Every structure is written in structure tokens, then in C-alpha cells.
Design a protein with these regions (language model features):
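Long, C-terminal-biased catalytic regions of enzyme "large/alpha" subunits
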Residues: 1-175
Length: 175
């Protein structure tokens, strides 16, 4: 399911970049050159609870490792597929990805001290494909606070744990 959601997110936001009216020429140039996206997730606490993990447990840390690896992998693979279909973003050559550097190469190695989970996706093939075809987007993921979108979705904020057993949230646009 995550694979399909990541692909749908990348392809939908790709269409919005081209559909968007840009009131400032500089914004249009920057956006079309880099085609940056900011796909993140909300409801991590719910995901962990639903899968039987306390937020600060070893099981949770292992589950988050698996989730975030898959999330990054599927986003990159979708962008790589779009690059095959439409070409890479104009500024691809100025990204770390053009040098074959992937998130698995730059993550904070302290993570290895809290989880022994190993990588499960075929990163070597993806690296080769990215070097050959590029990426359609220079940035794909972002972990935003997501306060207002979590209200609309009736979910917990992004990656944050709940603040208490009961939370009452209101958006500026109403309950």
C-alpha cells in the first residue's frame, strides 16, 4: 500500500507543478528547475499503536526504520520512473543524487545504535537507475509539523507522539 501511495503522491504533485500559475517569474524558474516536492507522513503514533508498538520501544524504532526506508525508496523510485518518462529535472546535475549519493549514504549513523534492522530494498539497482536516468525531482520528502493537516485527517501530527491521552485541536478555519 505504501508503494502505491508514494507513487500517487509523486505523480499528483508532479502534475501540480506544471499546472500551477506562477505570479513571480523567479519562483517559476526555481520551481521548474528543481521540481521540489515535500511529501511527508502524519499519524506515526497511530501507525505504531495499530501495530502494537509503544512509541519509545525497540519495536517502534525497528518499525520506523522499516517505514522510513520504504518511504524514501518508493519516493525515489517513482521520481526515477518519471524521469524515464519525461526526463530529469533541469537542475538534476547539481543534486547529490547525480553523484549517486542516496539517503542510505547520508543518514545519521547513530541510528545503527538503536536498531539492528537492515536495509530491505534494492538500493544498488536504484542508484544505478538514478545515475542513468536521473530524478524528476531534486527533493522528495519533508517531515513537516503538519498541525493543520492532522486536524483535517483526524490524525496525530507527523512524527510527533501525542501530547496526552486527549487532544483538542482547532484549525484557523474551524474545528
Amino acid at each position: 500500500e505504501l508503494e502505491d501511495l508514494c507513487d500517487l503522491s509523486v505523480r499528483s504533485l508532479e502534475e501540480l507543478i506544471d499546472y500551477q500559475d506562477y505570479p513571480v517569474r523567479a519562483a517559476e524558474i526555481a520551481t521548474l528547475g528543481r521540481r521540489s516536492l515535500g511529501v511527508g507522513f502524519i499519524g506515526l503514533a497511530h501507525y505504531l499503536a495499530k501495530n502494537g508498538h509503544k512509541y519509545d520501544s525497540q519495536g517502534a524504532w525497528d518499525a520506523v526504520h522499516k517505514l522510513t526506508e520504504s518511504f524514501q525508496y518508493y519516493l525515489l523510485r517513482s521520481s526515477n520512473q518519471l524521469a524515464r518518462e519525461k526526463g530529469p529535472c533541469a537542475d538534476f546535475g547539481s543534486t547529490k543524487y547525480s553523484d549517486g549519493i542516496l539517503p542510505i549514504d547520508t543518514y545519521k549513523s547513530d541510528v545503527d545504535e538503536i536498531t539492528q534492522e537492515r536495509l530491505t530494498h534494492d538500493w544498488d539497482t536504484l542508484r544505478t537507475d538514478i545515475k542513468e536516468f536521473g530524478l524528476r525531482h531534486s527533493t522528495l520528502s519533508a517531515q513537516m509539523p503538519s498541525e493543520s493537516s492532522s486536524v483535517v485527517s483526524n490524525a496525530t501530527n507527523g512524527i510527533e507522539p501525542p501530547r496526552g491521552y486527549l487532544s483538542i485541536k482547532k484549525s484557523k478555519k474551524g474545528p
